Amino acid sequence: MSHEGVIQFEGEHKRRELEARRYGELACELIAWREIMALTGLVGQEPGRYEGAGYGNASARIGPRSAAIGRRSFLITGSQTSGNRRIGLGDFAVVDGYDYRANRVRSHGCAMPSSESMTHAAAYDASPLVRCVLHAHSPVLWRRRRALGFPETDPSVPYGTPEMALEVGRLYRETVLPERQIFAMGGHEDGIVAIGRSAEDAGGVLLRWLARAYGTACGEGDGEVCST
């Protein structure tokens, strides 16, 4: 049974509209890249994938780089919104704070925050330079993750958990993640995460690696052209 998209943290969520004046511009940047991800099959919802569950999400930091760990607030696409063909500000939430040990997330917005909020939070805690996180689902990238040299989380660690958050921190400290800006989720089928200093930066990283993965697929000589 697929657990894709199921929230596994305790939430303190206040349901209220997000101010367009404060969050609208950043939301539009994320919506633009989410559209690109949808067109390339990196985010969405299909009957034949993951038992029909939605997949993929996007976030961006808000507030100063100097914010304390655990309080690096961010705007993130809402839970169960991956299958929506179009989204707006009402499909986002703001994560105001989080605690790995307590497995708790504080947030507000019309939508509940993504089930992967802990993973996004861990990327922001890893470095104040990280200002955007894009979580994609790509069979071609995931299958070629080792050939491409991606850092990879422990396959025994489930997604959306405090343990996954700790894994993300470990990858940032101990691997080439700061330079490559991308990692694979070893125990989360097709899960790929790109990080960057902006949505454009993270999106560019994701697309460059995707192009490289398709290029290696075409060069394998298996009779298929750019097979996923």
Task: Give the predicted meaning of each segment.
Residues 1-228:
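Glycine-rich flexible loops
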